[in-house]
């Protein structure tokens, strides 16, 4: 363990230059600490904030929003969330082949399908874990494809791995909410029905003692029928909607867990490539946010390095001369 529990400095952060907006990509400290805690969010909390694992997700919902998921798509305050053209949502699909198997090599090289896929039943139906709309449109023309159907959970069918992990909330990956995302200074009515949604916020993130006696809620020893939030919270999700550990599993991300916005992507690794093709050269040194196709600044970077070391060598030569 790289830290002491006996002595801990108070939380402090440098003021940021920008506020987090809807759909910004955010780096944050994973709020639930461990895989175990992801499914039992009201039982375990161990590490100091700065010692928690860094994650990167999209802030689909920000403080004060009401979020809902319908058929895998996010709705904010009743309106479908619109992403920039750089974002590519991916979903799982069921694919029925005509007569033969699918080659992993062909899937990777011809369709850029890098996530797992395989047969799931006796009818030889394949489940592809993640494909974008563009990939699906191309893949439908594959000579061995009979049918392609998006794989969605059933509305009203409860997934125990989904927040708030409570039998009274029949939510799953594709049908979730509505849920209010806490905003600093906002007061909500608090009762036994909505307590599972905000219990960890009140008890862990905002350092209160919370007890329930029959149907009565006590915060710091006093009967509570409402609660005022102390900080902002965010709802962070991955664009790979069926293969992402995100707020659907652990709930809200507090403001004090936010590290910032990523600006630059300096390396992109292709696990299916070989040799130099393991590096995605077109994605190196590209900006994270923005519209349109990302521009790589890798070549200008190499030119800059060449000039820098050239000048350095020339100065050394002149000094020796």
PLM region spans:
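Extended hydrophobic leader/signal-anchor segments used for secretion and membrane insertion
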Residues: 1-321
